[in-house]
Amino acid sequence: MPLLDSFKVDHTRMNAPAVRIAKTMQTPKGDNITVFDLRFCIPNKEILSSKGIHTLEHLFAGFMRDHLNNEQVEIIDISPMGCRTGFYMSLIGTPNEQQVAEAWLISMQDILNIKNQDEIPELNEYQCGTYTEHSLEEAQNIAQNILHRGVGINKNEDLLLDDNLLNS
């Protein structure tokens, strides 16, 4: 089985919160697609709560679209990582890490501005597979933590795993 790009970086050296360009590719028609690693937590040291990450999933994508989409950028998807340390964001376009970090911070402030759980979009049994597993309070705690710590930038060249580790 081929090794996925996300497993070629050393998770012990990742900073968080931080943005990383995980992958870039071009469609057959020439559109640029960029996948970002939006790392909320230091891998193997911190983890996002289940209810908090689920509520973030419902809120974060909409707010990021509000602040990042433009004539050159369109977000395709923002999905939580299985390890619960962040999200992957796939988009059409090539914004830089700083633009993404700024949109992320503004989105976290937007989450703090939500007054009650009724404002969470798609929070019902028809549109959500586990609609009872949400916590606005936990999502807001995560957002506050991001705003308090700030968002840095992780570079792939600083995180590449040594070939000996890849083959062990």
UniProtKB/Swiss-Prot annotation:
PANTHER family found in the cross-reference section: S-RIBOSYLHOMOCYSTEINE LYASE
Binding site for Fe cation: H54, H58, C128
Name listed for the protein in its UniProt record: S-ribosylhomocysteine lyase
GO molecular function: iron ion binding; S-ribosylhomocysteine lyase activity
Pfam families recorded: LuxS
Its job: Involved in the synthesis of autoinducer 2 (AI-2) which is secreted by bacteria and is used to communicate both the cell density and the metabolic potential of the environment. The regulation of gene expression in response to changes in cell density is called quorum sensing. Catalyzes the transformation of S-ribosylhomocysteine (RHC) to homocysteine (HC) and 4,5-dihydroxy-2,3-pentadione (DPD).
Enzyme type, top EC level: lyase
Biological processes annotated in GO: quorum sensing
NCBIfam families in alphabetical order: PRK02260.1-2
Enzyme Commission designation: 4.4.1.21
Assigned keywords, A-Z: Autoinducer synthesis, Iron, Lyase, Metal-binding, Quorum sensing
Domain of life: Bacteria
Cofactor: Fe cation
Naturally occurring in which organism (per UniProt): Histophilus somni (strain 129Pt) (Haemophilus somnus)
Self-association state and partner proteins as the record states: Homodimer.
Gene3D superfamilies (alphabetical): S-ribosylhomocysteinase (LuxS)
